[in-house]
Amino acid sequence: MGNYSRRRFLQGSLAIVAGNVLPCAAMAADNPPLWIPPLTSVGRGSPILLNARNVKKAFDNNKVDAWGFNGSYLGPTIKMKQNDFLRLTYRNNLSEAIAINIQGLQANGEVSGSINRNLAPNSSWSPIIQIKQSASTCWYHSDTIGRSAYQSYRGLIGMWIIEDEESKKNLLPNKYGENDIPLILQDISLNYDGQQVFNLEKNSFLGKQLFVNGQRNPFINVARGFIRLRLLNASVSRPYYLHLDNQQPFFKIASGLGFLPQPLEQKVLLLAPGERAEILVNTNQNKPLRLLAGDSANIIDKVRGWLGMSDHLQNNLVVELRPQGLASAFAQQKPTLPDAKLGLPLSPQKERHIHLSTQDAMINQRRFDPRRIDIFAQLNSVERWVLTADQATGFQLQGAKFLIEQQNGERNKKEMLAWTDTVWVEGETRILVQFDNPSSNSYPFIFGASNLLLADKGCMGLLVVQ
């Protein structure tokens, strides 16, 4: 075989990729309709089964093996009301042990699940969970020690919505799948057979393609007016910078665990891994709106990605919103929100410094040890945690909630505050943590990197609240 230079190879590859990529833009009409995870609304005391098992899923054109709950890739969306309770049965029909965490659930450590409740194959666990918290958008996913990233990536993911009476009284869109739309973002790499590919060797994983509710480049027909999007970054490591293609602003109305004091108009939304947010998008127009995740890869980036040399996404469309019907007068008015229940001012009783080492997968120079409690906090207290990291990464906390007090030396204004459990740490980040739920040495909470692969490598710790 003659001498074949790298430059000639790249030039040939560019021609191939250009031939494959350019027609796709002209085939936007072939984009799939957005799949909406089935809704399970829970009444008072109702039982729910989450059955983890093997499923078939077509990421590309071929159906391949994946994981999921109740027979589908990704689990059902569970909706509950404040002050309701349910009997939740986790069933493991997979060939390896799993543990499931409901991230954002404000409950005691004994019923929270997570690493404290490891389910062997063909076993089950049935906690009774009471919902005390205000309106929230939570999510459930694998939290198995050393395997949470891989198992979540395979499909052990679902959204969990909590409503309260005050939020129902407001005129916010609340028709699930119509004007209140769940969007679960994942970056996934596929092989030539359309099967998921995952690399466990590094401390982070960046997939090549963006999937939303298990689909690439989906669209949804929506009524004109305000549309509520519940956004969940379910990617292992990748953050997302979300914006509309026409640079139109939208209103952020909530973080994962509560509403903002008032709608916050912005053009870009950053979502850390594991973070949730709610936004309102005005679709009172004649043209489709495209929600995008950063910039799309150009042809060179696509080639580099094909060669394993680029971390750019090959596609960046989250969803295309296609307005239908008559214009809505309501969309001309700025929406109002329920009480954010911030309880300000918060007076911290203690300050802690927490450093995430993204290179060595440690917190404060210590790697995770399931036999060691790293932090003891007092029940019903408030603490200030000062977060830093070697490189920008996500941080999350279980069983408690916090307000983001300061980021990169800038203090957040009151109108930017909302309760959450996840934050992107770039530079110094100060959070005010409120401990409303008890845990114990036998059933501790966890905290640490929201990059699940980094957490699996040891960048997390155990928290006891008493």
From Swiss-Prot:
Post-translational changes noted in the entry: Predicted to be exported by the Tat system. The position of the signal peptide cleavage has not been experimentally proven.
Cell membrane keyword on record: no
One Pfam family here: Cu-oxidase_3
InterPro entries: Cu-oxidase-like_N, Cu-oxidase_C, Cu-oxidase_fam, Cupredoxin, FtsP, TAT_signal
Keyword Signal: yes
Similarity annotation: Belongs to the FtsP family.
Name assigned to this protein: Cell division protein FtsP
